[in-house]
Amino acid sequence: MAIYHMQAKVVSRGSGRSAVAASAYMSCSRMYNDYDGIQHDYTRKHGLIYQEVMLPPMAPSEWNDREQLWNAVEETEKTKDSRLAREFVVALPVELDKDSNISLLQDFIKKNFVDMGMCAD
């Protein structure tokens, strides 16, 4: 039986977080943050099953590169307490296979975020 769990967090400069660092961590990748000059390297982190950047139609195509996307967010939001991103942790049903879970998440993200003009990573 599937167990429901969903946790929502805000990535905020006020709490000392960075959208570039959060994206690098979640995608197990290396990214340079133009805002503070820090290189975030999480290439040794394991456990990534799938990654995708989803953009609304009006978003620039260069934002398909997550490093450019999150650096653009960091550049746009200037204040010390800026809310840069939202992070969601969702439990997926173990009864479904990997492809079904990916499709389930893609549909959820598209309907609830991308169709409302937000970028999703």
Briefly describe each language-model feature range.
Residues 1-121:
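N-terminal nicking endonuclease/strand-transfer module with a His-rich metal-binding environment
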